[in-house]
Amino acid sequence: YLSIRQGKPLLKKYLRGDVSDWWWNKNVMNQMQNWSGFFPPDIEHLSRFCEMMLQDASLLDICGSFETVQRGLHILRPYMCNPLFIPLSFFDPFVTSRPWSRVLKGKKVVVIHPFAELIEAQYARRSDLFDNKDVLPDFELRTVKAVQSLGGDNQGFKDWFDALEWMKREIGKADFDICLIGCGAYGFPLAAHVKKIGKQAVHFGGGLQLMFGIKGIRWK
């Protein structure tokens, strides 16, 4: 989006990979709908989404990223406030003997995810999921069932932003200390919203379900 906004670059910058496509790529636009649940995937709505993401980037405290995209992060740094950058895998609490998730013990935790009911069922049998009990400690669990709008299913909302506002209202009904989020394109803006209301949020993305022992095809 930043490349589109800046316009056509010098050819050598594009060939070096210093800048991305400076036109609206139809494949990327369709992926936003089919993979991330954004709708409608037109220029007007996507531009609004991108501007919101740039504004919310300033609220990041810790940013996990794939090594393959770290080179391109310099483009976003002007919109950030010096967050700590870590490998994305560090968010997985089950890969270490001293998981970060141990701090959830005794807290009020709300999980925002399409698999809300399954996550509640899995948490009820958490003692069977991991040998290290600190991965999923004893806390007060609440869930908000995220809107699942992948593939163009609008779920009765007029657009993605309408669905986002509905989820913000649902979050406002919950009493919690920490919010764990995994819900496609909604995740990062919801995490920013949680911080704005004075609470803490961890935006996992798709990997959140693993924390509750729920596998998916991508991990087979």
Model-identified regions with their sequence ranges:
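Short, flexible loop segments at boundaries between secondary-structure elements
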Residues: 142-154, 197-220
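Glycine-rich phosphate/diphosphate-binding loop of Rossmann-like nucleotide-binding domains
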Residues: 135-143
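Short Gly/Thr/Asp-enriched flexible loops that form oxyanion-binding sites at enzyme active sites
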Residues: 186-198
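A short, acidic, amphipathic alpha-helical segment used as a generic capping/interface helix at domain edges
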Residues: 46-48, 161-175, 186
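Electropositive, gly/pro-rich neighborhoods at or near active sites that engage anionic ligands
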Residues: 1-135
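Extended, charge-rich low-complexity interaction segments
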Residues: 37-41, 168-182
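Gly/Ser/Thr-rich loops at beta-strand to alpha-helix junctions
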Residues: 1, 68-71, 114-118, 180-189, ...
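Glycine-rich phosphate-binding "P-loop"
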Residues: 79-86, 142-166
